[in-house]
A protein has these predicted regions:
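Membrane-embedded catalytic interface detector for glycan/lipid assembly enzymes
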Residues: 81-239, 246-260, 445-449
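Membrane-interface helix-loop-helix junctions at transmembrane boundaries of multi-pass membrane enzymes
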Residues: 23-29, 171-184, 388-399
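Hydrophobic alpha-helical transmembrane segments
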Residues: 5-13, 108-112, 155-169, 354, ...
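Hydrophobic alpha-helical segments
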Residues: 353-449
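A structural signal for hydrophobic alpha-helical transmembrane segments in multi-pass membrane proteins
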Residues: 11-118
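Hydrophobic core segments of transmembrane alpha-helices in multi-pass, intramembrane catalytic enzymes
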Residues: 8-12, 61-68, 160-170, 201-217, ...
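Small-residue-enriched transmembrane helix-hairpin modules in multi-pass membrane proteins
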Residues: 134-153, 247-380
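Central hydrophobic cores of alpha-helical transmembrane segments
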Residues: 30-39, 182-192, 244, 378-381, ...
Length: 449
């Protein structure tokens, strides 16, 4: 695979140049997502930790996906904008409207606190590693934390998306309006949710949303208009706080990693696992399924159900009243993805075992084979680019939230497929519901308001 080691840097340079000429900066979401995937594919070719190097077919599919996304982003044009004074007023109204989420979070905090305290108690009775194995339920065994598959499902369908969208929105409103209370409540919920499931990605999400929101707001602040001037003044006051928050989240992430690890793991092994293997093992898992002619990936095709997995799950829940034998695509995929696979050999000659991290590549190939590696990334790049251009052109905070969510999808798809879960789709629904009234009101004449 030496050829890919040389080709990927050249390809990445091509992406940077093309997006720079299109958007005037390489720090645009198309380039960020493309370089993210290209960088980790390059690292995968180095096999730094003993993981197998992905095959030619897999690497060609990934590069095709990146190129198709690039084409969609380059060809996209921004929609017609609105007058600056209307946008400024709408941003203020949107901030007030999102404060209604406080009431919803007020109901969430007691429930999440209850399960948080229960999780702490179970840590001491079950042990950290024992709790980690039992916290997620399945069809045959309910979660030790929730005690019921229905309660766990309710939490996944309602509570997790609300926590997710509150994190996304509170960071934006903190950077734009210094709304510390909204951010504090969201951070507390994120920490409790992460600890009770021993999940580290919540903190990764926080650092990402903080960075990407600051980056995009800073870019919009360079536009010389009333909105840009307001953003420029706002972000000057939060730079130190941003650094402190990011550092705290990294420290908590490190502590949770130590808690979840085996006693024999040292800091170097933890860093190697989280910084390298977690970001590249998905290529190997997908490659092994792709090259196995008897795997489900090669024996079946799901015609779009996998990429609409969250919607599919909700639909199956409703339709089970008619046919109790119905299974969602995520339930069909889960048993196979939970099986550990040998993905390499460490320096001591022991096999490296991983599961779950199949990336969005698995969903796309299962849905539509090679065709979907052209079509889906093109559409994704197109919508990502239009949201970015809309944001730079208008400065609408609602557009920024959707832009952040789409960028998040492109970045974290390297681990698992966000669209196959319910959090992504319910979060989009919540964004739509909170922004819809504002959209309807802004088209009214100014004199009528």
């Amino acid at each position: 695979m030496i050829e890919f080691r040389y080709f990927i840097p050249v390809f990445s340079l091509f992406v940077c140049l093309l997006t720079f000429f299109r958007f005037g900066t390489i720090l645009n979401p198309i380039c960020i997502v493309a370089l993210w995937w290209s960088f980790w594919l390059f690292v995968a070719n180095l096999s730094l930790t003993g993981l197998f190097i992905p095959g030619v077919h897999t690497q060609v599919l990934i590069l095709t996906m990146i190129f198709s996304m690039l084409c969609g982003g380059i060809l996209a044009k921004r929609r017609a904008g609105f007058h600056g004074k209307n946008i400024l007023r709408n941003n203020l109204q949107l901030h007030k409207k999102w404060r209604y989420l406080y009431f919803i979070l007020g109901f969430l905090i007691p429930v999440v606190s209850y399960y948080f305290v229960k999780a702490i108690r179970l840590f001491f009775s079950e042990g950290i590693l024992g709790y980690r194995d039992a916290v997620f339920g399945d069809v045959d065994r309910p979660s030790v934390l929730f005690g019921s598959n229905y309660l766990e499902l309710l939490y996944a369908l309602l509570f997790s998306p609300i926590i997710h969208v509150s994190l996304l929105a509170s960071i934006v409103f903190y950077l734009c309006f210094q709304d510390r209370r909204f951010l504090a409540v969201s951070v507390v919920l994120v920490i409790m949710d992460a600890v009770m499931r021993l999940g580290r990605f919540n903190f990764y999400y926080f650092v990402f949303f903080l960075f990407i929101s600051y980056l995009f707001i800073r870019q919009r602040s360079r536009v010389r208009d009333p909105i840009g001037n307001g953003f420029r003044a706002a972000i000057k006051n939060v730079r130190v706080t941003i650094g402190a928050l990011a550092l705290c989240m990294v420290l908590i992430l490190s502590v949770l990693s130590v808690m979840r690890s085996e006693n024999s793991d040292n800091i170097a092994n933890l860093l190697k696992r989280f910084a390298v293997e977690y970001h590249t093992v998905g290529f190997v898992l997908f490659d092994e399924s792709l090259e196995n002619p008897t795997s489900r990936l090669n024996q079946e095709i799901s015609y779009g159900r996998s990429l609409l997995g969250g919607i599919d799950t909700i639909a199956v829940i409703l339709l089970r009243r008619i046919d109790r034998n119905l299974q969602s695509i995520s339930n069909e995929n889960s048993p196979l993805m939970r099986e550990f696979q040998v993905v390499g050999w460490d320096y001591d000659g022991y096999p490296i075992l991983y599961n779950a991290f199949y990336t969005i590549l698995y969903s796309m190939y299962l849905d539509g084979r090679e065709l979907f590696f052209f079509a889906i990334p093109f559409l994704y790049g197109y919508f990502l680019s239009t949201r970015y251009q809309d944001w730079i052109g208008t400065g609408e905070i609602g557009t920024l939230m959707v832009l952040n969510m789409l960028t998040y999808t492109g970045i974290f798809s390297i681990f698992q497929s966000p669209v196959e879960g319910t959090i992504f789709w319910v979060t989009l629904l919540l964004l739509f519901l909170f922004n819809r009234i504002r959209i309807l009101r802004r088209i009214q004449p100014v004199e009528a308001l």
